[in-house]
Design a protein with these regions (language model features):
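Bacterial N-terminal signal peptides that target proteins for export
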Residues: 2-14
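Bacterial N-terminal signal peptides
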Residues: 13-22
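Gram-negative and organellar
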Residues: 27-469
Length: 469
């Protein structure tokens, strides 16, 4: 590993030490650390035959460092939260990683790091933070201000730069779909088709009006817009509503409107009745990816999915719990014929674009023993799938040592890929030992057997440390 990633981690640790030394008398701090060693291999099918794939080794070390602080005296008015990830892949030389867009053999990602201040109903957050609503989850570097009155009425506003893979200590996890992280390699080669705007800063701003817990009812109306070099990359309006007071009737509904094309992007509605020994819920959804406006998929062919679910949970007295669920999905292939890029042929007798199925399961918890069995079947668009999943675990010595296992069986008949057909088996074993009250070590083995990739073996070693100062 180069000195870059460890140096960043040392700088973060030094900053944390200064903060601890300066405010320890009136503050509390929580330190969380995880080290992962990952050993497995992936199969590459390009330039190889299905029977003789190229094996790509993965030998990764990943370290997570989380440091949180808050005040003890004044009701946690001031605080900060942070999480840093440092990783190195010893099975991927850095020279090979540079040949692929968005691939890194070693680096550091600042997942989030922000300072928080709250007083008299106001809440301020400054730094890298995540934001979630009905349409998406994103990360941005900037400021969020929120106010909530004693009556439950409030508002929030936020502005900053969208966190993208090409940014400083950034990951591409939360950036819009449908585009590459960067064209730096193509630009260096003088490729005329390279896009320099992929790494351009993307300003983001938005706001929401809020109503919280008025006789069990909460609601919000929001707006968000992002720009790349002055052009709109994303513009959305959202509305959400919730009702619930524990047992009895509970409901949630929301919609996400794409203002750039002025059409419904996401929607969800759920009604649930919670009784003492049972619960019944019905849900309807419209789902599709959140594409960047620079993506060809956004303008050419989107694939929204409409889905309906009906579920019944039964939890009688005793250690057993049961559920049964029915699911139906309708897949849309919306091709923009106005662009004249392609034509959709409607063939009589073609495969249906819907799937139907369901699942059922039971769980058991008695003392230190826990177990669950789930069965799932779906048929229709894309073929059929039958899944059986059994998990079991036991805690020894008051949970200081735990042993968990999982067995999975799937019978798949994929209508698009003939190699995805037959029986697929998987097994996992997770052993975990508490070294101290704050530290725990774990070892995970995974084995998969199937006609597609034949055999896959994976090993993970984890060391977790959690301490309060």
């Amino acid at each position: 590993m180069s000195d870059t990633a460890p140096r960043r981690l040392r700088h973060t640790a030094c900053l944390a030490a200064l903060l601890l030394s300066g405010t320890a008398s009136a503050s509390a701090f929580q330190l969380e650390m995880r080290t992962e060693a990952q050993v497995y291999q992936m199969r590459a099918w390009r330039d190889s035959s299905p029977d003789e794939p190229v094996l790509l080794p993965r030998r990764r070390i990943v370290q997570y460092l989380g440091l949180n602080g808050y005040e003890l005296v004044t009701g946690q008015d001031v605080g900060f939260e942070s999480s840093l990830r440092v990783f190195a892949d010893f099975g991927l030389p850095q020279g090979e990683a540079l040949k692929l867009d968005g691939l890194r053999s070693e680096d550091a990602d600042l997942l989030y790091a922000f300072v928080r201040y709250g007083t008299h109903g106001f809440d301020f957050r400054l730094g890298r933070q995540t934001y979630t609503d009905i349409s998406d989850i994103l990360a941005f570097d900037g400021l969020r201000v929120r106010y909530m009155s004693p009556l439950g009425l409030g508002a929030e506003a936020y502005a900053g730069l969208w966190v993208k893979g090409a940014g400083f200590l950034s990951s591409s996890v939360y950036q819009p779909d449908g585009t590459r992280e960067s064209d730096a390699r193509r630009l260096a080669q003088g490729d005329p088709d390279a896009d320099p705007t992929l790494t351009a800063p993307e300003p983001l701003y938005g706001a929401r009006l809020l109503l919280e817990n008025y006789k069990g009812f909460s609601a919000s109306v929001g707006y968000r817009k992002a720009l790349v070099e002055g052009k709109t990359d994303l513009e959305r309006a959202t509305v959400e509503a919730r009702y619930g007071r524990g047992r009895g009737l509970n409901a949630i509904a929301g919609a996400d409107l794409d203002l750039l094309q002025f059409k419904l992007a996401q929607a969800r509605a759920q009604v649930r009745w919670d009784g003492e020994q049972y619960a019944v819920s019905g849900e309807a959804m419209r789902l599709q990816p959140v594409y960047s406006a620079d993506s060809i998929w956004y303008w050419f062919a989107t694939a929204p999915r409409d889905e309906a679910r009906l579920r019944v949970d039964f939890y009688p007295r005793g250690p057993l719990r049961y559920y049964v669920q029915g699911v139906g999905s309708l897949y849309h292939t919306e091709i923009n014929s106005g662009l004249q890029l392609a034509k959709a042929d409607l063939v009589t007798g073609s495969a249906p674009t819907y799937t139907v199925g369901g699942s059922a399961g039971a769980s058991l918890r008695r003392g230190s023993l826990r177990s669950a069995l789930d069965l799932t079947y779906r048929y229709g668009y894309g073929g059929s799938q039958l899944w059986a999943d059994l998990t079991a675990g036991y805690g020894f010595r008051d949970g200081r040592f735990t042993l968990d296992g999982r067995l999975s069986l799937a019978h798949i008949a994929d209508g698009f890929n003939p190699l995805l057909a037959g029986n697929f088996f998987g097994a996992q074993l997770w052993a975990s030992q508490a070294v101290t009250q704050a530290a725990r070590v774990s070892l995970v083995f995974e084995q998969n057997v199937n006609p597609y990739t034949h055999y896959d073996s994976k090993v993970f070693f984890l060391f977790d440390l959690k301490a309060s100062l």
